[in-house]
Amino acid sequence: MNDKLNYKLLNIPDQLGEEAIKTLSQEPEIKNTLEFIQKTDILVFGIGKAEEMAKRRRIPEDKVNEILSKGAVGEAFGHYFNEEGEIVYKLNTVGIDLETFKNIKESIAIFAGKRKVDALIAMTNINKNIVLVTDEENGYKILEELN
């Protein structure tokens, strides 16, 4: 399927040490995928609520509290950001980074859950060129928040 759609999927654990990242990044298949990411035109991604994503990623409770105390409302690509779209914490991850994300021609956010509206709005402060896929209820909630 990936040949027909010309896409790549990078399956690597979220949090790795510097040495592991360096080693993995040199593996031929991973290196090829990372190079592909730099040239991509279309990205489909999700946005998470900061606290939920930190817990899902098994970040220690004291670090979660630190991230939230810095005003984090959302997370994407291992970056935790506040309402203004400022990065308040970054995980050690392999894959897409925010600079690459900002330069992709078509970014498509798949979004569900009213509780994440503030995260989505904050993400638009990072990159305004986002196509949003959501349901009607969330669409109205976003419009309500923006007005």
Predicted regions and their residues:
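Conserved phosphate- and dinucleotide-binding cores of soluble alpha/beta proteins
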Residues: M1-N147
